[in-house]
């Protein structure tokens, strides 16, 4: 019997949703950073086994929005819960169930798919705190399963995969065996550049940036020539992004090029232009140009 289905991964910002997706896939498709609210779009990735096919939706973290981009991210995450076959709800060890987790649980009550509670980052907590957290969440919702894991250390993730197959319905193979994502290459390129910016910039700047791929061409020798706009909200941020003697921008470019060459399996030449677009996160038309469609 072949099983298949759509699986959404939900949770508060920075609980490890993208790390888990990347671990299960064995490919780096979702942007990973230690800063919250890193994922902005629902990334659809496909994992095919001998008797199953899972289509993952890696959502932005659900949080209280502060601008139109935040509204997009929350709408995108809550919409992903609807019409799926299985939900993975990620959280981390805690002393009490917080407001963010309770808000997600309320959204889960409106759908019929089974929900597996995944307690991530257990390697960073004591066994007593892990047990207490599982008990706390068991009182909040009737989960189909509850499982502690460490996505970073790949602890207990094989067991999680078995549980996911268990709860998948019988179904067809939606995508070819060798297809691992439905997003375009240009989107992944933009996400890689944004990840490197996130890792190299200070606290205030990162979430005020966006990346727009202006050009992506492959020459006769197979080398990619890529030009991107790195968009920020303030002129002062532009100076921070460029850095003294251009060093910060050079570091973003060099680390992005290395990752892009791994992803594209080809040589890459990348040029990054820093542009200021004041309050772009509250500009609906610009947000849509940048690919954020789910604004209400």
UniProtKB/Swiss-Prot annotation:
GO terms for molecular function: GTP binding; GTPase activity; ribosomal small subunit binding; small ribosomal subunit rRNA binding. The keyword Secreted does not apply. Residues 3-170 form the Era-type G domain. It holds the Pfam family MMR_HSR1. Residues 120-123 are annotated as: G4. GO terms for biological process: ribosomal small subunit assembly. GO terms for cellular component: cytosol; plasma membrane. GTP binds at residues 11-18, 58-62, 120-123. Residues 37-41 are annotated as: G2. Residues 58-61 are annotated as: G3. Residues 11-18 are annotated as: G1. Residues 201-278 form the KH type-2 domain. Belongs to the TRAFAC class TrmE-Era-EngA-EngB-Septin-like GTPase superfamily. Era GTPase family. An essential GTPase that binds both GDP and GTP, with rapid nucleotide exchange. Plays a role in 16S rRNA processing and 30S ribosomal subunit biogenesis and possibly also in cell cycle regulation and energy metabolism. This is GTPase Era. The gene is era.
């Amino acid at each position: 019997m072949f099983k298949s289905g759509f699986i959404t991964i939900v949770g508060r910002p920075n609980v490890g949703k993208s790390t888990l997706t990347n671990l299960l896939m064995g490919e780096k498709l979702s942007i990973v950073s230690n800063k919250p609210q890193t994922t902005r779009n629902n990334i659809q990735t496909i994992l095919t086994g001998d008797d199953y096919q899972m289509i993952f939706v890696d959502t932005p973290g659900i949080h209280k929005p502060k601008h139109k981009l935040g509204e997009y991210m929350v709408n995108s995450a809550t919409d992903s819960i609807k019409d799926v076959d299985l939900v993975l709800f990620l959280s981390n060890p805690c002393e009490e169930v917080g407001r963010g987790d309770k808000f997600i649980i309320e959204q889960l009550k409106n759908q019929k798919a089974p929900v597996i509670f995944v307690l991530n980052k257990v390697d960073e907590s004591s066994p007593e705190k892990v047990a207490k957290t599982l008990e706390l969440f068991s009182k909040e919702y009737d989960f189909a399963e509850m499982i502690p894991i460490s996505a970073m250390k790949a602890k207990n993730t094989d067991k999680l995969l078995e549980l996911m197959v268990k709860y998948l319905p019988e179904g067809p193979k939606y995508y070819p065996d060798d297809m691992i994502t439905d997003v375009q290459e240009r989107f992944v390129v933009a996400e890689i550049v944004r990840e490197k910016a996130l890792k190299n910039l200070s606290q205030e700047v990162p979430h005020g940036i966006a990346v727009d791929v202006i050009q992506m061409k492959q020459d006769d020798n197979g080398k990619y020539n890529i030009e991107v706009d790195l968009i920020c909200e303030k002129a002062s941020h532009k100076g921070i992004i460029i850095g003294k003697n251009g060093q910060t921008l050079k570091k973003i470019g060099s680390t992005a090029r290395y990752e892009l060459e791994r992803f594209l399996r080809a040589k890459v030449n990348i040029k990054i232009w820093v542009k200021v677009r004041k309050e772009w996160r509250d500009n609906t038309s610009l947000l849509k140009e940048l690919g954020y469609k789910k604004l209400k």
